[in-house]
């Protein structure tokens, strides 16, 4: 049996940098406003995994109303959810992440993001794809007000 999950997340720029995305700290004059570390890529990926196992969303498992998760490392949240995936008898087939941002430039950091995600999801890096695009200066991402990310995962029954 296979399961597909989709995730989406958005965070607004604010405060001091760096931007944490895909498990990588990217130098930038602003950070992202969030209850946790604001890693939109890992939040979307975490939601995709939760969706694939029909387990709700990241806010249900790590609510921003709980101080326990304040400043949380999103890599730890991702690993926790992947443990739940494995407990249900699934393993990752592949993950595909799309980052929508006018700034900062993501291209120099994509390989490091793929490596971090592959490590956290206990898979070969060839099963992880991260790509970035701009919105041609349209919308809130185009105005450099924030970053949006989508993620899709394919899970296989072990």
From Swiss-Prot:
Give the enzyme's EC designation: 4.6.1.12
Highest taxon of the lineage: Bacteria
**Pathway the protein contributes to:** Isoprenoid biosynthesis; isopentenyl diphosphate biosynthesis via DXP pathway; isopentenyl diphosphate from 1-deoxy-D-xylulose 5-phosphate: step 4/6
Keyword Isomerase tagged: no
Enzymatic reactions: 4-CDP-2-C-methyl-D-erythritol 2-phosphate = 2-C-methyl-D-erythritol 2,4-cyclic diphosphate + CMP
Q: Which Gene3D superfamilies match?
A: 2-C-methyl-D-erythritol 2,4-cyclodiphosphate synthase
Alphabetically ordered keywords of this record: Isoprene biosynthesis, Lyase, Metal-binding
Which cofactor(s) are needed, names only? Answer: a divalent metal cation
Which residues are listed for 4-CDP-2-C-methyl-D-erythritol 2-phosphate binding in this entry? 9-11, 35-36, 57-59, 62-66, 101-107, 133-136, 140, 143
Q: How is the cofactor bound?
A: Binds 1 divalent metal cation per subunit.
Give site residues, Transition state stabilizer. 35, 134
Q: Which InterPro entries match?
A: MECDP_synthase, MECDP_synthase_CS, MECDP_synthase_sf
Q: Name one GO molecular function term.
A: metal ion binding
CDD domains membership: MECDP_synthase
GO biological process per UniProt: isopentenyl diphosphate biosynthetic process, methylerythritol 4-phosphate pathway; terpenoid biosynthetic process
Which parts of the sequence bind a divalent metal cation? 9, 11, 43
* Membrane-spanning segments: none
For this chain, the family text in UniProt reads: Belongs to the IspF family.
Its job? Involved in the biosynthesis of isopentenyl diphosphate (IPP) and dimethylallyl diphosphate (DMAPP), two major building blocks of isoprenoid compounds. Catalyzes the conversion of 4-diphosphocytidyl-2-C-methyl-D-erythritol 2-phosphate (CDP-ME2P) to 2-C-methyl-D-erythritol 2,4-cyclodiphosphate (ME-CPP) with a corresponding release of cytidine 5-monophosphate (CMP).
The record's subunit annotation is: Homotrimer.
- This protein's name: 2-C-methyl-D-erythritol 2,4-cyclodiphosphate synthase
């Amino acid at each position: 049996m296979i399961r597909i999950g989709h995730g989406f997340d958005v965070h607004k720029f604010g405060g001091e940098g760096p931007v944490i995305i895909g498990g990588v700290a990217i130098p930038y004059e602003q950070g992202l406003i969030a209850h946790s570390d604001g890693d939109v890529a890992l939040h979307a990926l975490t939601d995709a995994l939760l969706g694939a196992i029909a387990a709700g969303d990241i806010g249900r498992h790590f609510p921003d109303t709980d101080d326990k998760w304040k400043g949380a490392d999103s890599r730890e949240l991702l690993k926790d959810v992947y443990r739940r995936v494995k407990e249900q008898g699934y393993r990752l087939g592949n993950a595909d992440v799309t980052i929508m941002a006018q700034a900062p430039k993501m291209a120099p950091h994509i390989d490091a993001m793929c490596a971090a995600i592959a490590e956290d999801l206990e898979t070969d890096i060839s099963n992880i794809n991260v790509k970035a695009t701009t919105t041609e200066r349209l919308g809130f991402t185009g105005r450099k007000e924030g970053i949006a990310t989508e993620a899709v995962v394919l899970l296989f029954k072990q």
